[in-house]
Amino acid sequence: MDSATIDRATIDRATIDKTLANVYRGQKWIVATDVAAGATSAIRYMIDRGASEVMLVAAVEGVGELPDVPTHYTRTQGTTGMARVMDGVRAFDAAVTRPSRTLRAVIDRFDPENEALAIAGPFSVATEIAGRHVYGAKRPEWAALEDKMIAEELWEAAGINHAPATVVSVADAARAAVEMATLEGTVWVADNREGWHGGGDYVRWVRSVNDMADALDWFGVHADRVRVMPFLEGIPCSIHGFVTRDGVAVLRPLEMLVLRRTDRTGFVYAGAANHWDPPDLDRDAMRNAARAVGNVLRDRVGYLGGYGVDGVLTEDGFLPTELNPRLSTGHGIVAHVADLPLEAMARAVVEGSLDLAAAELEAEFVERGDAVRGGGVRYSIAKVQPDRSVDICFEEGGAVVAEEENREAVLATARSPQGGIVLVNFVADRMPRGRSVAPLAVAALSHARAAWSIPIPPLEAAPEVR
């Protein structure tokens, strides 16, 4: 099914709402999420549908309205000082899955009868939190798909076009890179020795032999094996799907804001947005590839829920680079514009409480995703940041402060599980429809560096080559 042949069936919102109300009604819940403000709408949804009591465990407050429920803050954050997204995510996950006496006591006071259900984050593989069952927990065989070393085998099984890659020991990575390098070099990604990872934290762009020593040193500390592939020039992008019991729903493509450092080798993951549109033939090719991968996941391990295929739209078309077997940023963008509680729906699908028709889900998300755009910048830094914001607009020379009536984005900072975060929320109806917003992300981050003395390196956006 490509974008031209989607059945425009209407998703049954009333049945979804009734089913989720039956899940939440009369039940105590413990929600564990690293950023409290990110759970506000979900917790409000649970309470509105009859949850008896809800407790939140979070690392930090975040930006925006906070949930009006009892909240315990772990205050965990990454310990490496490198602002890696995974540092903060893992620190928080460890805090809730191996709770301190203090946290366990707080949970036991909230739920003395040990009858609450728990909700964990998308990376978590926990099946319980302080003895409470995690509703919609990830199965071990699904978690195993987080291994970046198996990507090529999945692409082959799905029968989709992909770039060459090889998996080698760190000691053999330099040799493999020499054999695979293009004029722009190679890209290396680590295995899961230190656990699951995402957000580009364990990826390095090795442009030439001059970069190899630093790369070998870094991977030697953090990995046993690496996957080496040629550097792919073009727009970093992703295509997301959702596996139900009756099929696979595929969403529309979106742009991954993977920026490039200009002072040295390296990528910077800075969020995602769906303002960009690939050519129609590439859009259909991306969606067909995601559908094929979703079918492999369902047939091999009985996968259910969201997944994403990251890649690059090169001059030769879309080439995948990695699989993300979980709900991620792209799902969140489309769920927001469609006004559907996708995280709650996904957990209920996994638990067997909710049946979703893949064709209806796909039609809803593609139609809404095409009609309403969203997304923005999420740039992590090691230094804790104060809560502040400013309206900006974009001129030829970069981003400048704007009056409210002229704003094209809101630039903000806040505390995060990594230390601090810089946020850029684009005003959707003032963004160039169909074009990459990565250059605007670069301009906004450059303004934050200059105006607030934030240690953001010089960055540039990937070029469109298709």
Where do the protein language model's features map onto the residues?
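ATP-binding N-terminal substructure of ATP-dependent carboxylate-amine bond-forming enzymes
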Residues: 1-143, 171-174, 439-456, 460, ...
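Short, charged, surface-exposed secondary-structure boundary motifs
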Residues: 64-68, 143-151, 198-199, 216, ...
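A conserved helix-loop-beta module that forms one wall/lid of the active-site cleft
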Residues: 132-203, 209
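Glycine-rich phosphate-binding loop of ATP-grasp-fold ATP-dependent ligases
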Residues: 186-215, 236-238, 260-278, 331
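Phosphate-binding site of ATP-dependent enzymes
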Residues: 207-263, 313-319
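A long amphipathic alpha-helix within ATP-dependent nucleotide-binding catalytic cores
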Residues: 222, 267-315, 360-382
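ATP-dependent carboxylate/phosphate-activation module, predominantly the ATP-grasp catalytic core
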Residues: 233, 241-296, 301, 324-347
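Peripheral (often C-terminal) accessory segments that flank ATP-dependent C-N-forming ligase machineries
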Residues: 347-466
